[in-house]
Design a protein with these regions (language model features):
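ATP-dependent adenylation/pyrophosphate-handling site
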Residues: 16-70
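Feature marks short, surface-exposed loop/turn motifs that line or immediately flank catalytic pockets
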Residues: 54-57, 100, 169
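Alpha-helix N-cap and loop-to-helix initiation/capping positions
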Residues: 66-74, 104-108
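A conserved beta-strand->alpha-helix junction
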Residues: 51-53, 82-97
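Metal-dependent de-N-acetylase/amidase catalytic core
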Residues: 1-21, 103-273
């Protein structure tokens, strides 16, 4: 695990000041998940961690000939530049492959994450939600949950949040969905996301997609009222998974989906009568 402290801040002081930690699967996932949160806080109190090395990134254009080995170095450098520009308190690059995170090195990944949690003592952790379409994202969610559950209760964060990337969360019932004002984060996105040149110039316009999603979340949040926010992020409250170790994450997600099922059935039944 490589630990990068932006701005040359002394390591122990930087880690001691962390209040919110985001653990992501890939470089740029930190920003896609939590720019809305970051825009509303002191960035020096924020730390990001990237589980995989980015070797399998899609590529085209001027990046079409980049090898996997070169892409690993390139994506790490891009993430460091973004952390520096945003003013993060700390950035951890775990450097695993997707296969490591999914199966081969689960224990090692969870150990690294648990050590990072102990080093930073965050009040809140943000990661991928278990309904994400990307298998590596779901695997990182599982590794984060395993890492937290390996710690004694007094060493755990107070909150665990699941964020949007490869599936929007506007479908979540209100009981488990938190809406974050992401207007300031969307302003940050215009500056930070284009810095991931290997992605936005290599075939994936994450910068434009992120901004579009935030605006859509805000506008389509309520059909019978004016917009509360100009931009919004939807996040899933998963805290119950770290206060009740016996709760299976599948059962947790099925309960959320069942809430959605009941909500939509009630609306449809009412329209059919």
């Amino acid at each position: 695990m490589e630990l990068f402290i932006p701005r040359g801040t002394e390591k122990s002081a930087a880690l001691a000041g962390i209040k919110k930690l985001c653990v992501a699967a890939h470089e740029d996932d930190i920003e896609l998940m939590t720019l809305g949160v970051l825009g509303n806080m002191n960035p020096a109190e924020f730390a990001g961690a990237v589980a995989t090395n980015g070797a399998s990134s899609p590529r085209t254009g001027r990046f079409a000939g980049v090898t996997d080995e070169e892409m690993v170095l390139l994506r790490a450098e891009e993430q460091k530049k973004v952390a520096e520009a945003a003013g993060y308190g700390a950035l951890a690059l775990l450097g695993y492959t997707s296969a490591d995170v999914k199966t081969e090195s689960r224990a090692a990944v969870e150990k690294d994450i648990s050590e990072l949690i102990l080093a930073t003592s965050p009040d809140e952790i943000y990661t991928h939600n278990p309904a994400d379409r990307h298998p590596t994202h779901v695997a990182v969610f599982c590794r984060v949950l395993g890492a937290i559950r390996s710690l004694p209760p007094e060493k755990r964060p107070k909150k665990l949040w699941g964020c949007e990337v490869w599936r929007s969360l506007d479908w979540l019932p209100g009981a488990v969905r938190t809406v974050v004002d992401s207007e300031k984060g969307t302003e940050l996105a215009s500056t930070l996301l284009p810095m991931f040149e290997s992605q936005v110039e290599g075939g994936k316009r994450y910068d434009e997609a992120y901004i579009g999603r935030q605006r859509a979340n805000a506008t389509f949040a309520e059909s019978h009222s004016t917009d509360e926010f100009a931009c919004a992020s939807n996040i899933l409250d998963m805290t119950v998974l770290i206060t009740n170790d016996r709760l299976d994450p599948c059962d947790f997600l099925y309960d959320v989906i069942d809430m959605f099922r009941r909500e939509t059935k009630k609306t449809l039944d009412g329209a059919m009568k």
